[in-house]
Amino acid sequence: MDYYVTLSPGLEKISKNEIESFGGKIKEIRENKGRIFFSGDLKLIPKINYLSRTIERMNILLHREEIPNIALDDIYKRVYNIDWTEWIKENQSFAIRPLRAGEHNFTSIDIGRVAGEAVIKSYQRDKNIRLKVNLDEPDVIVRVEVIFDELIVGIDTTGDIALDKRGYRVFNHPAHLNATIASSLVYLSDWKDDEMLLDPMCGSGTIPIEGALMKRNIPPGKFRENKYGFKFIDIFGYELLDKIKKEIVENKNIYKIIGLDKNQKYLDGAKDNAKNAEVLDTIEFICGDATKLHEKFNESDVIIANPPYGIRIGSKRSVKKLYDEFLSSAKEIMHGSSRLIVITAEDKMFKDAIAKNNFEVKEEFNVMFGGLMTRVFYLTL
């Protein structure tokens, strides 16, 4: 079966490794576009929805085609020719979730209207039954995307609420990091079991929590199952997911994870989130200043940070000072094999701080985060 996933653009390399670890065979990676196409068996559906830490949505690919000067009639014909009786039961409702990118003489609303009509007519042809449409809470979500001249039609196995919404969060920081990006940064750091992980500006605790979930082999889908659910259950039932759950072996090991923040309110919220995620006992939350790390710690193996960008929190001038002093302090507690991973939208300002503190940039790349272009830096001494 063919599939495609969506994720934060820029993190395709990390999600590719995750898909392959689940047994998926990569067919195409859309670099910096947040899409990966692959194939595999049905088990991939519950595996990715329940176990993936870096992917936001998984879809079954029903049709993909380049159509020069694509028109609404082209969309109708391709959608009409799909056997919808295979995916939608007679008593189920459906909804089209359209997406359009590029220059066209139609809107995404037009795509939704035409595709919806095609599904209804196609089903009537095959079953002599008119399917129900439910735009708010459909049983089956059909994704119809027109990306320039390409038409992509798929069944959404995740649902309207993407996988980055884990379900454990009870406290929201005003600039909290997307959970799938946080997990991707932890993967990037190659953090070992016996190493210390420090987030010096932890906010609501996303990075420490995602790191702890990873080390304890706690599936991220565990907390969203009852809160948000998974759309594939409506199509395939619980059997596939139950089989995956039986294979999971969690552990209660204690790992060296520290979340630091100078705002006690954020720390209290982070503790609540960690408690909900069943990892509070392995994370030490400390009130402290990211520019004075040497006063709290002798050394750290892995530092991962999502510092303020000066957009939602802090002014540009204060951010520049923070970056300079943070890197200066981080350098004092790093050793030869330490890694420092930072994500920021103020990459020019951060590059100045890197140069000023003589760090080596091992890797850097762009990541789209909430409509904002950010840059990830992997630094060593």
Curated annotation (Swiss-Prot):
SMART domains reported in the protein's UniProt record: THUMP
Record-listed S-adenosyl-L-methionine binding positions: H173, P174, A175, H176, L177, S204, G205, T206, D261, D289, A290, N306
Alphabetical list of Gene3D superfamilies matching this protein: 3.30.2130.30, Vaccinia Virus protein VP39 (3.40.50.150)
Name of a matching Pfam family: RlmL_1st
Keywords of the record: Cytoplasm, Methyltransferase, RNA-binding, S-adenosyl-L-methionine, Transferase, tRNA processing
One BP annotation, GO: tRNA methylation
GO molecular function per UniProt: RNA binding; tRNA (guanine(6)-N2)-methyltransferase activity; tRNA (guanine) methyltransferase activity
One Gene Ontology cellular component: cytoplasm
InterPro entries reported for this sequence: DNA_methylase_N6_adenine_CS (IPR002052), RlmKL-like_Mtase (IPR000241), RlmKL-like_Mtase_CS (IPR053943), RlmL_1st (IPR054170), SAM-dependent_MTases_sf (IPR029063), THUMP_dom (IPR004114), tRNA_guanine-N2-MTase (IPR053485)
Annotated catalysed reactions: guanosine(6) in tRNA + S-adenosyl-L-methionine = N(2)-methylguanosine(6) in tRNA + S-adenosyl-L-homocysteine + H(+)
Protein family: Belongs to the methyltransferase superfamily.
Reported function: S-adenosyl-L-methionine-dependent methyltransferase that catalyzes the methylation of the guanosine nucleotide at position 6 (m2G6) in tRNA(Cys).
NCBIfam families: Trm14_Arch
Family annotation (PANTHER family): THUMP DOMAIN-CONTAINING (PTHR14911), TRNA (GUANINE(6)-N2)-METHYLTRANSFERASE THUMP3 (PTHR14911:SF13)
Protein name according to UniProt: tRNA (guanine(6)-N2)-methyltransferase
Organism per entry: Methanocaldococcus jannaschii (strain ATCC 43067 / DSM 2661 / JAL-1 / JCM 10045 / NBRC 100440)
